From Swiss-Prot:
Gene that encodes the chain: azoR
Catalyzed chemical reaction(s): 2 a quinone + NADH + H(+) = 2 a 1,4-benzosemiquinone + NAD(+); N,N-dimethyl-1,4-phenylenediamine + anthranilate + 2 NAD(+) = 2-(4-dimethylaminophenyl)diazenylbenzoate + 2 NADH + 2 H(+)
Stated role: Quinone reductase that provides resistance to thiol-specific stress caused by electrophilic quinones. Also exhibits azoreductase activity. Catalyzes the reductive cleavage of the azo bond in aromatic azo compounds to the corresponding amines.
Name assigned to this protein: FMN-dependent NADH:quinone oxidoreductase
Binding-site residues for FMN, renumbered to this chain: 10, 16-18
Species of origin: Rhodococcus erythropolis (strain PR4 / NBRC 100887)
Length: 214
């Protein structure tokens, strides 16, 4: 049965744009067929501990003498990686926090990006190559091409580098911009533009869920 891994990281539990959008994708995915299943991971409600040992960055065969991570931490990493490899499609809610990603999502990245296991190092193996991953990023301002603000987006580019370039996954990026226009009076003239960005994000996610779940 096709499986979706649905990951949220927003600290906002009741009015989150990224959560709403990943939920839309997951619902549309499920609508494709009763055989479609979803595994949901909430990194805010159930955060991973920060990586306990730098040795976990490497496959066991690449560790130097004396690098012996705690077996419990190693087992946790294995479970997180297995959850990712078992999925046919992945959707990740990655809201922009201080121009970067939530620390909970960074912790997850540190668990799954492992030289010699999920990332080529001494071999050319890329077990996640070609697996579709949809990055859903909400942001208070605009960082679109031509905005003059592109260089300040440290949310999407690192995820594309890790998941797409390093791990070989097939990355799609959907953004919903200007979410602060509803909150900050000085940004009120941008409300309509923000609403349009949200509508476009919803339309794109609906279509992606349909095509990836076909």
């Amino acid at each position: 049965m096709p499986q979706l891994l649905h990951i949220d990281s927003s600290a906002e539990l009741h009015n989150s744009t990224s959560r709403d959008l990943t939920a839309l994708f997951a619902q549309q995915w499920s609508n494709n067929s009763p055989d479609h299943t979803t595994v949901t991971v909430d990194l805010h409600r159930d955060p991973l501990p920060h990586l306990a040992d730098a040795a976990l960055h490497y496959a066991p065969r690449l560790r130097v003498e004396g690098e012996i991570p705690d077996p419990a931490a190693e087992a946790l990493q294995a479970r997180v990686i297995e959850q990712l490899t078992a999925a046919d499609v992945v959707v990740i809610g990655a809201p922009m926090y201080n121009w970067s990603i939530p620390s909970t999502l960074k912790a997850w990245i540190d668990y799954v990006h492992v030289l010699g296991t999920t990332v080529p190092f001494d071999t050319r193996t890329q077990p996640l190559a070609g697996k579709p991953v949809v990055i859903v990023s909400s942001r208070g301002n605009t960082y679109a091409p031509g905005s003059g603000n592109e260089a300040n987006d440290h949310t999407v580019p690192p995820l594309v580098q890790v998941l797409g370039v390093s791990m070989g996954m097939d990355v799609s990026v959907i953004t919903a911009e200007l979410t602060l226009a509803q909150r900050i009076p000085a940004m009120a003239p941008l409300i309509e533009q923000g609403d349009a960005s949200l509508r476009a994000a919803r339309e794109s996610l609906t279509e992606l869920a349909r095509t990836l779940g076909a």
